[in-house]
Structures are given as structure tokens and as C-alpha cells.
């Protein structure tokens, strides 16, 4: 009865937006969400309008709270590769679509649903890992940070303090979920001089590993 009532309410919601699933919203979902939200994926499918429409209000809440797509890293600390985070414009469009009645639009504009397969993880070039915290004995090119044993709901800050006192924020994870476990590869690897102290601010027993780029593969 609840689902029938919800669907009936949706059917009577006024349409007050020109944003549609077939033109704008499906493209955002396919690019940012569907890698998990597809048939057989890690979460319920959102690849069709009929699948996404009942979740419209939940989608609005999740994107406004920046809980979806799951990423973990606080925005603005550092640029990372493969960051699925929504842009401000994408958030605005998703919210506007939901608040405007979540219309479907003309099927002629609908893009092809992407295909997904269980691909092997992409391996970035790295010479090895350094367990943190640590004081560097020689200069290194930092390529990535991987959190270890960070509990659900906890936060972690990894910061490099260089010998001259300058500070580089490597990653800040907030309200972490172990299901999000990943390596945060820097878009631009960072040269850290000898004597740099890399600190980890996180609850025990959490730690982190710094991946170091191989010479000649800094980018």
C-alpha cells in the first residue's frame, strides 16, 4: 500500500523544470553513479528512469549531503585521479530535477546505457609503500595514500610537514566507511624533501601507507 501510495503521489507531482531524465540526468547518473548502481553491481540499479524515479527524493538527500557518490575525501584538500565526486553544477541539476517533479523526457534523447564488467583494478606506477607516520630519510615523490584499519565513521588527516615548516595536506577523510576502501592517487605527484615529517591524525589502530612513484614515472 505504501509503495502504491508513493507512486500515485509521484504521478500527481507538478512538473516545474525543463531538466529531464533522458537529456541531462541520465548522463550524470551513468557517469557518476552507474558503475555501482547497475544490474548485478554493488548497489541497486539506477540505469533506467523506472528504476531511478522511486529513489528521486533519496537521491536529492544523498547528493546534498555529499554522501553519494561515495568517495570519502574532503573536497578541496588535494586533486585526485578517478574522483567520482559530483560538480556543483551536477548537484544543482540533480536537485533541480527532483524538486521540479523528476520528469522523464523524450526517449529520443536517451543515451545508450553503459556496459559494465568486472575489470581488474588499475595499477598505477609505484615503487613501493612507506608505512606512516614517518620522517623521510631521503626525498621521495609521493604518489598516493592508502588508509589502513580506519573504523567506520572515523576521520583521518594525513599531513606532510616539510623541514622549512611548510605544510602539504595529503588527504583528509571524514565519516569514513570501510566499504569505500581505496587508494587515493594524487593527480599530480608531490616531491617531498628529506626530513619531511608525515603525520597521521586518526584513532588507533588506524594507519596509512604512502605510495612512492618510480623515477621517471612521476606523472
Residue ranges and their predicted role:
Residues 122-192, 199-219:
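His-enriched metal-coordination microenvironments in redox/metal-binding proteins
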Residues 1-6:
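Bacterial N-terminal signal peptides
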Residues 9-133, 200-218:
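Aromatic- and Gly/Pro-enriched helix-to-coil junctions and flexible linker segments
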Residues 32, 194-195:
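Conserved SET/PR-domain catalytic core that frames the SAM/AdoMet-binding pocket
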Amino acid at each position: 500500500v505504501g509503495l502504491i501510495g508513493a507512486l500515485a503521489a509521484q504521478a500527481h507531482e507538478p512538473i516545474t523544470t525543463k531538466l529531464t531524465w533522458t537529456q541531462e540526468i541520465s548522463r550524470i547518473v551513468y557517469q557518476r553513479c552507474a558503475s555501482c548502481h547497475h544490474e548485478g553491481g554493488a548497489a541497486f540499479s539506477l540505469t533506467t528512469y523506472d528504476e531511478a524515479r522511486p529513489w528521486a527524493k533519496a537521491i536529492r538527500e544523498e547528493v546534498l549531503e555529499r554522501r553519494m557518490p561515495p568517495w570519502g575525501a574532503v573536497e578541496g584538500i588535494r586533486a585526485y585521479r578517478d574522483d567520482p565526486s559530483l560538480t556543483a553544477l551536477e548537484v544543482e541539476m540533480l536537485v533541480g530535477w527532483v524538486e521540479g517533479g523528476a520528469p522523464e523526457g523524450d526517449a529520443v534523447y536517451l543515451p545508450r546505457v553503459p556496459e559494465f564488467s568486472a575489470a581488474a583494478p588499475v595499477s598505477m606506477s609505484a615503487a613501493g609503500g612507506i608505512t606512516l607516520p614517518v620522517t623521510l630519510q631521503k626525498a621521495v615523490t609521493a604518489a598516493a595514500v592508502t588508509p589502513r584499519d580506519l573504523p567506520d565513521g572515523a576521520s583521518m588527516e594525513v599531513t606532510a610537514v616539510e623541514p622549512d615548516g611548510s605544510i602539504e595536506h595529503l588527504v583528509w577523510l571524514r565519516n569514513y566507511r570501510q566499504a569505500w576502501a581505496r587508494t587515493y592517487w594524487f593527480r599530480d605527484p608531490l616531491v617531498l624533501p628529506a626530513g619531511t615529517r608525515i603525520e597521521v591524525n586518526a584513532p588507533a589502530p588506524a594507519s596509512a601507507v604512502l605510495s612512492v612513484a618510480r623515477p621517471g614515472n612521476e606523472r
